[in-house]
Regions:
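Dynamic helix-loop-helix/coil hinge segments at AAA+ ATPase domain boundaries and subdomain interfaces
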Residues: 171-205, 529-537
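Conserved P-loop NTPase/AAA+ ATPase motor core
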Residues: 480-549
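Conserved ASCE/P-loop NTPase catalytic core
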Residues: 195-325, 330-334, 348, 468-483
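Extended, charged/polar low-complexity intrinsically disordered regions
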Residues: 1-191
Length: 549
């Protein structure tokens, strides 16, 4: 067994699982990933090939006989009645009804909302009352004709959570100290099913940026890139606390329904992700307007009330052109629907733009066969970390440059905070490790501002983003690779006939130009094309006269 697998299994005993086995079972079973991982951890926690094969057979048998499918609810209820008792894998929710002065359990796929549950389970697993948990349930059929109040024939005799029912953040942080940052990065990547040896350090960090909305409150993320790069995976499979929307939504659904008095998605979920963002073209303008206010402050107004939410927002879209074409001919928000891309104030509230074109399309060889966290355990860790704040961590060693305004600083700080929660949850990192994530955070925010500069001209002209070492006072400027980064003007000698020049207008704005002179057969006469007037036209005529002499 490789060293990292051995260490992971030792330090996080019972909380890691072999990811290749998850894929093998997932293909043939439409059940939540954390249910599969629980069963695999129970029956396949070994290196013995024969034992693993036997364990896989048990897992498949357990799923086929115990997993309750929603379309077979009546069949499952009838089977429990006929057999007298049965073991099911289902999601269990518990609510208190004052009229009955009693707690009732609901088995979601079993299709019954009134199941008797012993009170001691509520004391052991308080999450039963807060959204519910997936569990292995021993259910019994016994009809009591003498019972008072609401009658139900179904009773829970045993309940064993499949999800993490309790989580200790301090234990998680202490365990993190036993890994180097490189080992921890690799373990996180294997948790989402990827083999880290296929990716360089930068790509590993970009994969983790996708997960920042899961651990950072009110974080606004956008990613545009080719299809098939796994943009929305974390919001479908990694956490039960996120929701992925695949089409237009409404203000009542997303924020607050005044008719029913119920909170919308941003008040229920930790992160709300929009997949295929181009499909939002038909979304009402009011949604974007309200979302714009929410993305700035986490608040929104409905009727007379000002309400708050903590959900982060992630937007994913597909590009139909190579990035170099978009950079030259338009801007990187072009794949977004018109209702969003024309609202510069909304775009300015995005904290990070992931360059999805750098991430390769997923291939079979990119998937890992090694140990990673049980996804539900990591989901609990990320959810617990949302309560903590690392936005001031950057001040230990660095300060931000003068071109970053208040929104830019907020965006960079939140990105740094999110990456620290993911990579350094114990809060310990070197100066160089902090510099690495600060530089990435600055780059992601600058990518947003560079597009706004194209859309809004000089209103967003200050994009020379930098950060300063507080000890040496060295200022490091951060570029965006798709526009040439800091090497857009090469240090190599220019070809003959080419030159760079700069000019300052009457408002003090600086413009940088590249002049290229070509040579082709002509008539010997000067013809000035375009709308050139005044001083520039006279300069050209004077230069031509000089050459003609």
């Amino acid at each position: 067994m490789p060293e990292l697998d051995r260490k992971s299994a030792r330090v996080f005993s019972g909380k890691v699982v072999r990811k290749d086995l998850v894929r093998k079972v997932k293909v043939g079973a439409n059940v939540p990933v954390f249910v599969l991982e629980y069963l695999l951890g129970k029956y396949c926690a070994t290196d013995d090939a024969a034992a693993i094969e036997a364990g896989l057979r048990v897992v498949n048998t357990t799923i086929s006989s115990n997993f309750a499918r929603p379309d077979e609810a009546n069949k499952a209820q009838s089977m429990v009645k006929d057999k007298g008792k049965h073991t099911l894998i289902d999601k269990v929710k518990v609510r208190y009804l004052a009229d009955d002065d009693k707690h009732w359990a609901e088995l979601v796929n079993f299709g019954h909302k009134y199941v008797h549950i012993p009170e001691h389970f509520l004391r052991e697993y308080d999450r039963l009352l807060m959204g519910g948990i997936w569990a292995q349930v021993d259910i019994r059929h016994q009809y009591d004709e003498e019972a008072k109040g609401k009658r139900s024939p179904f009773w829970i005799d045993g309940l064993k959570p499949i999800q993490v029912a309790t989580f200790d953040l301090e234990e998680f942080r202490e365990s993190r100290r036993q890994f180097s940052s490189e080992e921890w990065l690799d373990l996180l990547l294997r948790t989402i099913g990827l083999e880290p040896k296929n990716f360089d350090r930068r790509l590993k960090l970009l994969f983790l940026v996708r997960m920042i909305p899961l651990c950072e409150q009110n974080y606004n993320l956008v990613e545009m890139g080719p299809r098939g790069t796994g943009k929305s995976y974390a919001y479908q499979e990694l956490s039960p606390y996120t929701i992925l929307l695949t089409g237009p939504t409404t203000v009542p659904n997303l924020f607050y329904n005044m008719a029913t008095g119920k909170m919308g998605l941003v008040g229920i979920w930790d992160a709300v992700a929009f997949d295929e963002v181009a499909d939002l073209q038909k979304m009402q303008k009011e949604v974007v307007t309200t979302l714009k206010t929410y993305c700035e402050s986490g608040t929104f107004a409905r009727g007379k009330d000002a309400l708050t939410g903590r959900a982060s927002v992630a937007m994913f879209g597909n590009t139909n052109q190579p990035v170099d074409v978009m950079v030259r001919s338009s801007h990187l928000f072009m794949p977004m629907p018109e209702v969003i891309r024309e609202d510069m104030a909304f775009l300015d509230r995005l904290h990070f733009y992931i360059p999805g074109w750098e991430i390769p399309k997923m291939r079979v060889e990119y998937f890992t066969d090694h140990y990673g966290f049980v996804v539900d355990y990591l989901a609990e860790a990320l959810r617990d970390l949302r309560k903590h704040n690392f936005t001031e961590a950057i001040d230990r060693h660095f300060s931000l440059g003068s071109h970053l305004n208040a929104r830019d600083v907020k965006a960079v700080r939140k990105t740094v905070s999110g990456l620290i929660k993911l990579i350094y949850p114990h809060g310990e990192m070197s100066r160089d490790e902090l510099a690495e994530i600060v530089e990435l955070a600055v780059e992601g925010r600058r990518r947003v501002k560079e597009q706004l500069k194209k859309l809004g001209s000089f209103e967003y002209h200050q994009t020379s983003f930098s950060y300063i070492d507080n000890e040496t006072r060295e200022e490091r400027f951060v570029g965006v690779p798709e526009q040439g980064g800091r090497d857009m003007i090469s240090s190599d000698p220019l070809a003959p006939g080419s030159a760079y020049t700069a000019s300052v207008d009457d408002q003090g704005k600086v413009g940088l130009y590249r002049l290229e002179v070509g040579c082709s057969p002509g008539t010997g006469k000067l013809k000035i094309a375009g709308g050139i007037e005044g001083t520039m036209k006279e300069s050209i005529q004077r230069a031509f006269a000089y050459l003609a002499a």
